[in-house]
Amino acid sequence: MQLTIIVLDSVGAGALPDAAAFGDAGAHTLNHTLKQAPVPLPHLARLGLGKLPTIDTSPETVPADAEVTGAYGRMREVSPGKDTSTGHWEFMGVQLEHPFQVFPDGFPPEVMDRFDAATGRGHLCNKPYSGTDVIRDYGEEHRRTGFPIVYTSADSVFQIAAHEDVVPLETLYEWCRAAREILQGEYAVARVIARPFRGEPPFERANEHRRDFSLTPPRTVLDALKEAGKDVVGIGKIPDIYAGQGFTESIHTDDNADGIRKTLERMKAGVDGLIFTNLVDTDAKFGHRRDPAGYSNALAEFDRALPDLIAALPEDGLLIILSDHGNDPTWHGTDHTREYGLLLAYGHGLSARDLGERETFADVGATVAEALGAQWDGPGTSFWNELR
């Protein structure tokens, strides 16, 4: 059997009950985006998007009268966070008791001294910053000195920006690996991220060369699938999020269009197991930059691709569409928002049904394990029987 998961990165479905504790009460990525920049999403509507509680419907965006052919629900995140690693780890059965470490004042000297020793250079910035602003403000000094630009955010990340004409990509990746070695124990951030950029001021981020260097997660459903002899194909930043653990094939992508194209290729190639894709543009290009129009266009791009993805499904295949957190482009600041995750599913012959409000993202992993015949006794309640 072939099961394909596509994560629409940051497409939140409304504030979680505890959102106020994260400063996000009232956030709603989907509703606010579509209100400011309406685009038609007819195919997502047919999967049940408009049936979800708190999703606003309208003839111009998500029509209320769409003939629903999929299964639909929304998911609570029980782990205390609103970042990529927390959400994706929980999808595959890892529920965190404590949030990943964050550094709102930058990284301490004992970290940065070791990092400087590893690179043989100094560093710039070392404080929370927007990715677009940090290269605008420090890019010229970086080109003069060759020092890497180190910055963080409200997420648990150590980000290293460098101009591609100043620092070769492989050198940047080596610096990230060195930082990953340093950032353990009390300094263990979830991800070290390579952020190359190019061009002239105000500079352009080279998103296709971004790489994430994650902490290694505990055992996940991905490991269970691999142990069961199944194909486990990670597309986009998915393999990086799990430190490459549990995959039989890893495929990097340039953008959402490339991610969709490579997902279709693997679906048509007869993968026996899981195809797991992250489409990051909504988050990286438009959510953090607070660009509702760009965000809406990315949603519409995916909606237009849905018929091709459905057509590529094998007769017994299943397509699941998820989101890992919110990133409301109309919200204050530039960081993620604590929201419900989307849950939409389609299979040939599957009738429309309400999967309700799932108590944890881990229900996804439990469902994947049961559907593909892998042994999993970790967190999560499978909804596989509700789909058959």
UniProtKB/Swiss-Prot annotation:
It holds the Pfam family Metalloenzyme. Its EC number is 5.4.2.7. Mn(2+) 2 binds at D283, H288, H336. Its main location: cytoplasm. GO terms for molecular function: magnesium ion binding; manganese ion binding; phosphopentomutase activity. Gene3D superfamilies: Alkaline Phosphatase, subunit A (3.40.720.10), Phosphopentomutase (3.30.70.1250). GO terms for cellular component: cytosol. It is an enzyme of class 5 (isomerase). Its cofactor is Mn(2+). It is found in: Cytoplasm. Keywords: Cytoplasm, Isomerase, Manganese, Metal-binding. Isomerase that catalyzes the conversion of deoxy-ribose 1-phosphate (dRib-1-P) and ribose 1-phosphate (Rib-1-P) to deoxy-ribose 5-phosphate (dRib-5-P) and ribose 5-phosphate (Rib-5-P), respectively. This is Phosphopentomutase.
